[in-house]
Amino acid sequence: ETSGSIIFSLDDKYIFYSKLDNNHRARKIYRHKIGNFDDEDELIFEEKSEAFTVSIGISSDEKYYFILTSDHNTSEQYYFSINEKIPKPKLIIKRERGILYSVSSWNGKFYNHTNKDAEDFKIDISESLEKQNWKPFITPKNEVLVGGCIFLKKWIIRSETSDALDKLFVRNISTNKEEELIFSDEKVCVPNISLKQKDRNTDEIYIGYSSPKTPSRVYSYNLLTKSKKLVKEQEIPSGHNPDDYIVERVEYESHDGRMVPLTITRHKKTKIDGSANLLL
């Protein structure tokens, strides 16, 4: 009957959870007081559309609960304060068919990751949700998929994808200076980041990545000193030396005239005279 996903309140007095409808979609959010019977649980939000599903989470700065309701290409979000004794979710932006958005809060500001007037997404910023005044934070870019943000006390980290390559960018909050986070000399890799500690008062993060020639690796990375330390690496039982392989990045013209990126991985001893087999 429930989705299995729960959120504990910061005071550890309540549990927020969602209930499933007959189509196995989460459409109701309840609050359960620990120690009470479940028939006393409070319904705090209900999605009326059978096509939408709901979820609840806590903001990065732990000041708000956010309720997200969405289908495949449309979303809508509500919020209420961590300190509200009787939760009354308030609408952020009314849903609009084909528009996705996700609002997060950090350091007294609100960040909206949305495809409104931006096919490949953008990020807007506002000082308030009661009196919204959205201004550009990351503007839309031609053929660049703009990802969301991860917040630390001193840093904002975000992602971009262009030409089928993923990139990470780091912004120093105090200077507002942003630069690309380059942690490997491999151009073709798939990076991802995760928090190293919950309170976010740190300069260190975990960066995981893999590439066509390199097994999955996880590094501890210092955003201030830009130093890194390998903490985990996927073991290949048969043995593997990344230096034995060459990864090349080329582009070919498609039937519609667009250039399509192609990654070629080969052993450094492989002849490139057309005699070797190719797995495409």
Task: Locate predicted features.
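Hydrophobic beta-strand anchors of alpha/beta hydrolase catalytic cores
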Residues: 277-279
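Polar, glycine-rich mid-to-C-terminal structural blocks
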Residues: 26-70
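Non-catalytic accessory segments flanking enzyme active sites
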Residues: 53-81, 86-104, 136, 147-148, ...
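Beta-propeller blade signature
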Residues: 30-36, 79-83, 124-128, 220-223
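A flexible loop/linker signature enriched in serine peptidases of the S9 family
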Residues: 1-3, 18-28, 47-51, 69-76, ...
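Generic long, charged, amphipathic alpha-helical segments
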Residues: 130-152, 161
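Hydrophobic beta-strand positions that form the internal "hydrophobic ladder"
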Residues: 15, 65, 110-112, 156, ...
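Conserved loop/turn motif of beta-propeller repeat scaffolds
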Residues: 12, 62, 107, 153-155, ...
